[in-house]
Amino acid sequence: MSIVIAAKGLGLRSTPAKLNLVADLIRGKDVAVAAMYLKFCKKKAALLIDKVLKSAIANARANYGVDADNLYVKEVLVGKAFTLRRVQPRARGRACRISKRYGSVVVKLLER
């Protein structure tokens, strides 16, 4: 059984739905191909997931001595982190709640 290398990004300032759109692009791909997809994707979530992917690659090199050329993205887990709630004043003395959602990402790599 190969070693699963993981990296987490917690409290990322993007909603889980937006993160999941980008995560679908790299699931099951080689690490080099996944990094290229994220580099040319024009979404903010791509930058956030790219940081987590690079962290997982660095973990593989530093902790396990695994070469990045042999790695592929086994799974990308996207979940809810927390929600900041704000109040926006509206007309006639009313107020509305604004929810600023945060997401979390776990990238797991496996050696081929």
UniProtKB/Swiss-Prot annotation:
Taxonomic superkingdom: Bacteria
GO terms for cellular component: cytosolic large ribosomal subunit
Record keyword Ribonucleoprotein present: yes
Pfam families tied to this protein: Ribosomal_L22
A biological process from GO: translation
Annotated keywords: Ribonucleoprotein, Ribosomal protein, RNA-binding, rRNA-binding
Molecular-function annotations in GO: rRNA binding; structural constituent of ribosome
Primary role: This protein binds specifically to 23S rRNA; its binding is stimulated by other ribosomal proteins, e.g. L4, L17, and L20. It is important during the early stages of 50S assembly. It makes multiple contacts with different domains of the 23S rRNA in the assembled 50S subunit and ribosome. The globular domain of the protein is located near the polypeptide exit tunnel on the outside of the subunit, while an extended beta-hairpin is found that lines the wall of the exit tunnel in the center of the 70S ribosome.
Family membership: Belongs to the universal ribosomal protein uL22 family.
Subunit record text: Part of the 50S ribosomal subunit.
Identification of the protein by name: Large ribosomal subunit protein uL22
Lineage: Bacteria, Pseudomonadati, Pseudomonadota, Alphaproteobacteria, Rickettsiales
